[in-house]
Curated annotation (Swiss-Prot):
This is Large ribosomal subunit protein bL36. One of its GO terms (cellular component) is ribonucleoprotein complex. It holds the Pfam family Ribosomal_L36. Coiled coil: none annotated. It comes from the Bacteria. It comes from Salinispora tropica (strain ATCC BAA-916 / DSM 44818 / JCM 13857 / NBRC 105044 / CNB-440). The gene is rpmJ.
Length: 37
């Protein structure tokens, strides 16, 4: 899980979602997981 000030999709399988008021990226590739914070 990478924590970044701005999250972006890295590949086509990345999905940007909101969870508990946080913007997150979930993906089939675990290295692409990101959270805004």
């Amino acid at each position: 899980m990478k924590v970044k000030p701005s999250v972006k999709r890295i590949c086509n399988k990345c999905r940007v979602i909101r969870r508990h008021g946080r913007v997150m990226v979930i993906c089939a590739d675990p290295r692409h997981k990101q959270r805004q914070g």
